Amino acid sequence: MKRLAIYIHGKGGNAGEAAHYQPLFATWSVVGMAYHAQTPWEACQEFPRLFDQLAEGYDDVALIAGSIGAYFAMLSLADKPISQAYLISPVVDMERLITDMMGWARVTEEELRRRGVIATDFGEPLKWEYLCYAREHPIAWRIPTHILYAGQDHLTTRETITAFAVRTGATLTVMEAGEHWFHTPEQMAFLDAWVNRVRDAGEA
């Protein structure tokens, strides 16, 4: 059986990060998806085509995705033949995240609707179009999924991630000292141990 794990990076990442996962999926091919989408509507145009190109000729395809990449993947690839998904710090409720960001920036919904785009001090512009899209396109995800969440994640609350895991039937593992971006040696060791544990459980 030919097996493939497709890695989808988050903001600021790149497809080359997939190399980290090759030792964890030693009998699989592991490849990063080199994408250009910066919005969910762009991802819904681009991701299905890239997935089909990468998955051609494989009998089993798994997904590894992080942060905004996981959000894009869940919106655009829900109907693809994916056997397992491994999501690291996924954004699972974009509407909640945007409204939280509006609160941080002290921007009202009426103001955002009127102005369309508002710059913020924390670097992420608020966009009315994005908020509307998130509301009109909720995630509908039924693929067997394992989630790794950081106790110090500043983008997704524990309440939000727990509710999503319950709704989708996903397993949820929490690294209490972890951050949204898993990058320190301790965090990466925890991530690797998590992959090994849930992968082996899924193959049992």
Give the location of each predicted region:
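Short, surface-exposed "cap/lid" segments of acyl-processing enzymes
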Residues: 1-39
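Short coil/turn segments at beta-strand junctions that form active-site/ligand-binding loops
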Residues: 2-3, 58-61, 83, 143-144
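Short hydrophobic segments within beta-strands
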Residues: 6-11, 64, 88, 148
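Gly/Ala-rich beta-loop-alpha elbow adjacent to hydrolase catalytic centers
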Residues: 64-73
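The alpha/beta-hydrolase serine catalytic core
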Residues: 81-204
